[in-house]
């Protein structure tokens, strides 16, 4: 056994864990970030003194610097599951940097904030010690090894170690010194650690390991000064810290010339008799997101500015909670959460998910008895507890941390019980969270009794209702992961929040996850399986972010902003009822602005100041209640902060009677021939193909609009959330699917009567019996208008359809369009709370969404009118759905990356009866029945007009 394979000794000469701080005054801080000498060895056992050094920037991940290929894997270990042993041929990166010391009068410490996975430290050729725990701080005292003058620090980083079995998180697997590395020079008699606790009854208690001077400040105002190892401060009329009111006091500790500052938030955490989460005595709703450290082009490395920007963006989406999946973040990230107001569920660097797959043909069940897991193995107890201790000690003084999480997807065993025992011995306030103790894959009775929160992943809406109605648990219930945001989505976050607001015990959850993990190669986002060195991979499952890897937003991002909005409203019969969904903040200083729109006009607009208290509602009466419209009516409501920021805009359609458009009903001239029916007018000429059951030519003002015949279709390029059902829709194998991606229209007969053409048809996937028996009826009028009627039945027993509608493939020149529908972003029947019904202008380029794996996008629901380039218009008396794309469904379906789509050769217009919803089934539950296109009888009418 090599030294780094012993789970009972995962460090040597590492300092005891302590709270994070950077001392000032007599202490000196020296960042070692920057250029280091570097040598990469494919086999650490054969490493020699480098004859030639490369240069590498620290922090960085060596896979992104040309040493090894990146590797993305979710559950499977990238090596044999044979704990505690790792591959005999174990790569190593050797880092070296020189520093110059002018004096040795102080104590010197080398601190590594993050290094993967095992690091051995040498100073001037002398061994100092080693550490494991990639995302955990490691501190080494190096005073003895240093000398006055030039010194050489060497850090040997091993790719794998025993700790790798505890770090099987869903992410690209990187190595190197990926967080800050720095030196501290401190007085020889200095404070090592301190602890700050607060009570919402005004107290701040500071405990240190020295008899120190301790000062308490409110901003720059000194409130009180005391001396001692334990000092208690009472703050008069304190401003309490919450995610909505992130007010911070400052504690300054002075000892032997050193100055240590710590920002402090006064708050307490409890659970109510109703099993609500209470912050400062008030019930709090968790509106969260899971946050991995991942950065566009940099892997696990994030600068201070990038971390701050993430917190700002997350806060801007009305999120109030981050789960640090699945390890502690950089400590500065937590400081930003304190500052901006984000609750944190701080997770230990712990996941052993791969043990589910250590034997073939095993279902998704944590069988902790058949095989020894790290969680049940006594040899691993010390390392489990050590990782929890290091997590707690570093971040114990951060106000934002409201829960400690033991880790992720590791099963429950006695070693986790020991971790909980440790936490309970040092922290009596914060809650203990561990999804594996109460998982849908198996609940541990011991684990359930020890944790403070029942946490699950991706429980269905029905499952949550069942738990709440049957009172299954006597603890707060949350989803640490829900609404899987992969690709086009998520589509169900609004529905989950409906239940949060209904059931006090359901305290909320954290969306999976914040940002896509990708590696950019020649401008193209790459993912698992794209790199030759990957021995196992999980494809594009890493592209599951609420934002793209560069932090740009998608429709799902805006949907979450709306679902998490701190208000909701309902409009009915002139009554506008507004509900404040803040936990602590009244609307007194906020502005509520509403607009009532009818067609293309705003008929009423007003700004209001309403003193709505948290979780309370107030109704106002509007002057206008639209009764008639040509296209549609709606009411939009903005909530504007005192600083002028629009926190969210929500919209609600208003039901009103449609004013029917006057139509020219003069029949067009029709000529019926053997295989074609011709229609001609002053500025148009159409040809209906009897063999195809639809038009194959539409000439308007001398220009042929069609690039291909019009056709009925039911397939869509699968979104990531279709990944578990695509085999039932498409030809993925020989036996399961309806094969809708290779569909045939069989025309049984065509009847021409005056200006009416009726085609009786079937739609079938290749090798399959008809899935849809239907009739297309078109009526052609003298002004060029075509009235379409679709009337048909879906085969009994057939699966629900992804969509159903007509495809009009137009010439490529037809790029611009104007529409009255839900916009401006793409939207679907379940993901439509981020849009409003209005007139919008767009084009094919604007509609395209650059998902890392190309997929269905660009649908607009609740449509009444679509006009392409002032040439052709689609209208309907009842709402329809449409999509305008520069790419065909086939192009999007076959491409695995954006550079594989090919060139745009046409403008593809879909006029759809309906599309099934988005959901979050890429990892979450099946799409809710109400959002499935499961109707068996279909009737759909729309007009095609000359614009």
Regions found by a protein language model. Name each.
Residues 1-18, 22-23, 37-43, 65, ...:
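Accessory beta-strand-rich segments of carbohydrate-active enzymes
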Residues 121-123, 202-226, 251, 575-610, ...:
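Beta-strand-rich binding/interaction modules
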Residues 1-24, 58, 65, 73, ...:
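Extended substrate-binding grooves/exosites of carbohydrate-active enzymes
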Residues 95-97, 136-140, 229-233, 616-622, ...:
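Short strand-edge motifs at loop-to-beta-strand transitions and within beta-strands
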Residues 144-150, 207-273, 628-665, 672:
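Extended acidic/polar, glycine-enriched regions
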Residues 61-64, 69, 76-85, 132-134, ...:
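An acidic-aromatic loop/edge-strand motif
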Residues 64-66, 159, 242, 628-631, ...:
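Beta-strand/loop-rich accessory regions of lumenal/periplasmic or secreted enzymes
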Residues 167-190, 513, 517, 524-571, ...:
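Catalytic cores of secreted or luminal carbohydrate-active enzymes
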């Amino acid at each position: 056994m090599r030294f780094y394979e012993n789970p009972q000794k995962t460090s040597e000469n590492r300092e005891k864990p302590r709270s994070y701080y950077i001392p000032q005054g007599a202490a000196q801080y020296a960042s070692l970030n920057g250029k280091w000498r570097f040598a990469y060895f494919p086999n650490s056992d054969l490493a020699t003194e480098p004859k030639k050094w490369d240069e590498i920037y620290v922090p960085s991940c060596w896979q992104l610097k040309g040493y090894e290929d990146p590797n993305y894997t979710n559950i499977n270990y990238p090596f044999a599951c044979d704990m505690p042993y790792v591959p005999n041929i174990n790569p190593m990166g050797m880092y070296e940097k020189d520093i110059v010391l002018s004096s040795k009068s102080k104590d010197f410490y080398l601190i590594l904030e993050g290094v993967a996975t095992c690091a051995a430290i040498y100073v001037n050729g002398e061994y100092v010690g080693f550490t494991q725990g990639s995302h955990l701080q490691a501190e080494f005292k190096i005073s003895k090894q240093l000398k006055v003058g030039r010194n050489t620090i060497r850090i040997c980083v091993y790719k794998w170690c025993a700790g790798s079995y505890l770090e099987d998180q869903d992410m690209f697997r990187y190595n190197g010194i990926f967080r800050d590395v720095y030196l501290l020079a401190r007085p020889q008699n200095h404070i090592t650690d301190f602890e700050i606790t607060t009570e919402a009854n005004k107290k701040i208690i500071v405990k240190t390991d020295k008899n120190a001077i301790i000062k308490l400040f409110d901003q720059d105002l000194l409130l009180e000064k005391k001396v001692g190892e334990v000092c208690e401060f009472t703050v008069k009329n304190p401003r309490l810290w919450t995610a909505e009111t992130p007010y911070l006091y400052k504690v300054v500790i002075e000892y032997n010339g050193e100055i240590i500052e710590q920002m402090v938030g006064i708050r307490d955490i409890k659970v109510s008799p109703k099993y609500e989460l209470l912050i400062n005595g008030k019930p709090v709703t968790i509106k969260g997101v899971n946050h991995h450290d991942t950065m566009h082009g940099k892997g696990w490395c994030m600068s201070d500015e990038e971390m701050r920007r993430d917190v700002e963006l997350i806060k801007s989406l009305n999120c109030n909670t981050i789960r640090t999946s699945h390890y502690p973040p950089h400590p500065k990230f937590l400081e930003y959460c304190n500052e901006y107001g984000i609750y944190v569920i701080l997770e230990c660097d712990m996941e052993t998910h791969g043990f589910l797959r250590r034997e073939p043909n095993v279902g998704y069940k944590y069988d902790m008895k058949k095989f020894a897991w790290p969680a049940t193995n006594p040899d691993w107890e010390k390392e489990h507890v050590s990782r929890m201790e290091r997590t707690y000690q570093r971040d114990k003084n951060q106000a934002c941390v409201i829960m400690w999480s033991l880790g992720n997807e590791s099963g429950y065993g006695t070693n986790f019980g020991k971790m909980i025992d440790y936490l309970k011995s040092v922290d009596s306030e914060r809650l203990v969270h561990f999804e594996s103790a109460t998982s849908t894959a198996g609940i541990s009775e011991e684990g359930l009794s020890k944790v403070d929160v029942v946490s699950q992943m991706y429980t269905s809406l029905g499952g949550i209702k069942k738990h709440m109605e049957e009172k299954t648990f006597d603890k707060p219930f949350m989803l640490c992961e829900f609404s899987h945001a992969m690709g086009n989505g998520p589509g169900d976050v609004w529905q989950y929040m409906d239940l949060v607001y209904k059931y006090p015990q359901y305290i909320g959850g954290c969306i999976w996850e914040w940002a896509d993990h990708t590696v950019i190669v020649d401008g193209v986002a790459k993912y698992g399986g794209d790199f030759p060195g990957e021995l196992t991979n999980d494809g594009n499952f890493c592209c599951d972010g609420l934002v793209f890897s560069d932090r740009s937003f998608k429709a799902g991002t805006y949907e979450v902003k709306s679902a998490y909005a701190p208000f909701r409203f309902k409009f009915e019969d002139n009554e506008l009822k507004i509900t404040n969904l803040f936990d602590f903040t009244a609307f007194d200083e906020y502005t509520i602005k509403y607009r009532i729109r009818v067609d293309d006009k705003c008929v009423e607009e007003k700004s209001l100041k309403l003193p709505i208290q948290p979780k309370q509602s107030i109704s106002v009466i509007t002057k206008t209640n639209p009764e008639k419209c040509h296209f549609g009516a709606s009411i939009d409501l903005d909530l504007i902060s005192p600083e002028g920021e629009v926190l969210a805009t929500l919209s609600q359609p208003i039901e009103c009677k449609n004013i029917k458009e006057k139509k020219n009903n003069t029949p067009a001239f029709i000529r019926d021939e053997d295989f074609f029916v011709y229609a001609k007018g002053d500025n148009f000429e159409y040809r209906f193909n009897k063999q195809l059951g639809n038009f194959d030519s539409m000439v308007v003002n001398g220009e042929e609009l069609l690039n291909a015949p019009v056709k009925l279709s039911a397939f869509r390029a699968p979104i990531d959330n279709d990944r578990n059902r695509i085999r039932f829709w498409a030809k993925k194998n020989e036996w399961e699917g309806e094969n809708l991606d290779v569909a045939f229209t069989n025309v049984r007969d065509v009847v021409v009567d005056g200006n009416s053409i009726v085609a009786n048809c079937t739609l079938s996937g290749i090798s399959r019996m008809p899935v849809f028996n239907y009739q297309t009826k078109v009526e052609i009028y003298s002004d060029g208008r075509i009235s379409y009627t679709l009337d048909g039945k879906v085969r009994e027993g057939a699966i629900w359809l992804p969509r159903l509608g007509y495809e009009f493939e137009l010439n490529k020149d037809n790029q611009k369009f104007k529409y009255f529908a839900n916009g401006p972003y793409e939207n679907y029947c379940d993901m439509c709370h981020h849009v409003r019904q209005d007139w919008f202008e767009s084009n094919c380029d604007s509609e395209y969404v650059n998902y890392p794996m190309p997929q269905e996008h660009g649908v607009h629901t609740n449509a009444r009118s679509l006009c392409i380039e002032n040439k052709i218009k689609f209208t309907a008396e009842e709402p329809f759905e449409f999509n305008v794309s520069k790419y065909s469904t086939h192009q999007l379906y076959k491409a695995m990356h954006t550079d594989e789509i090919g060139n745009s050769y046409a403008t593809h217009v879909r006029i759809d009866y309906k599309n099934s919803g988005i959901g979050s089934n890429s990892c979450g539950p099946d799409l809710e029945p109400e959002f499935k296109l499961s109707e068996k009888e279909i009737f759909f009418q729309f007009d095609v007009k000359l614009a």
